[in-house]
Amino acid sequence: MKSILEQLSSMTVVVADTGDLDSIKKFQPRDATTNPSLILAAAKNPDYVKLIDKSLESSENALPQGFTEIDLIKETVDQVSVFFGKEILKIISGRVSTEVDARLSFDTQATVEKARKLINLYKNFGIEKERILIKIAATWEGIKAAEILEKEGIKCNLTLLFNFCQAVTCANAKITLISPFVGRILDWHKAKTGKTSFVGAEDPGVISVTQIYKYFKEKGFKTEVMGASFRNLDEIKELAGCDLLTIAPKFLEELKKEKGELVRKLDVSTQINHSIDYEFEEKDFRLSMLEDQMASEKLSEGITGFSKAIEELEELLLKRYSEIKNHKLISAN
């Protein structure tokens, strides 16, 4: 009998949620997703020190004379994300998601400019924009930035998405893909209710993604739905049939080992017949987020967490740059 992973792959595009190149080689997914936390974890791995050094060297060459260490580190954050993305694309056949600095989540123009820069960095390596998804937090400003980018042919993945309002606003803006965070929705409900277990289809994260998926298919939206941030295998199984699921290596390994029949839960034909075409203007969007305590708290927490990961990455890069400089000085003497 085929493994659960093999069966899942026949009905859903399985995506690797990692920046670890060895894990991607092992599972051979079509696509891969990264975020600041995953890039930071990979950057801490001694196996990738040469990649970090190449990123620093590339940044030095890209900057004009007289640059400061602050300039260098900011440039290298972009470079290192693209260097990891480049290596990932050597392994997979599909797309890699590279995230815009989370600290720009409430600045539309800065997000657009950063996305264009990332695409240009990939272009310098001979990688076409069709293989890149630019990850942007699903704030109002982020969605507006993505709408601009999509019109330029830059495909986007709207992340940190926690409710129906965010999802529909992305779809109406003709965004390529959204990443609703299943597990983080579950985390919030566990913390608030004191309930330790939500089984199968009762999982609030599963309920949210199912609602979004069915509405999108009924209304004919082209925006792809990629479930993300899983806490257990049941969440993954309950979303079998979703357009894409991005899954951490530890769960990919468990799915690979497990046998048994996997039942498809989501299908284009399973619709819920909404009579309303939802559309959220800015004031409606902000009010909806304000009224949804879970979504507003988790969006804020996610942006804060990714921002801290970037700051830690900057510290790591600065430390490595200092080590390289000191080594060169010692060698020169």
UniProtKB/Swiss-Prot annotation:
The keyword Cytoplasm applies. It is found in: Cytoplasm. Gene3D superfamilies: Aldolase class I (3.20.20.70). Keywords: Cytoplasm, Pentose shunt, Schiff base, Transferase. Its EC number is 2.2.1.2. It is an enzyme of class 2 (transferase). Pathway: Carbohydrate degradation; pentose phosphate pathway; D-glyceraldehyde 3-phosphate and beta-D-fructose 6-phosphate from D-ribose 5-phosphate and D-xylulose 5-phosphate (non-oxidative stage): step 2/3. GO terms for molecular function: transaldolase activity. The active site is at residue 135. InterPro entries: Aldolase_TIM (IPR013785), TAL/FSA (IPR001585), Transaldolase_1 (IPR004730), Transaldolase_AS (IPR018225). One of its GO terms (cellular component) is cytoplasm. It catalyses: D-sedoheptulose 7-phosphate + D-glyceraldehyde 3-phosphate = D-erythrose 4-phosphate + beta-D-fructose 6-phosphate. One of its GO terms (biological process) is carbohydrate metabolic process. Homodimer. PANTHER family: TRANSALDOLASE. Belongs to the transaldolase family. Type 1 subfamily. Transaldolase is important for the balance of metabolites in the pentose-phosphate pathway. This is Transaldolase. The lineage of its organism: Bacteria, Bacillati, Cyanobacteriota, Cyanophyceae, Synechococcales.
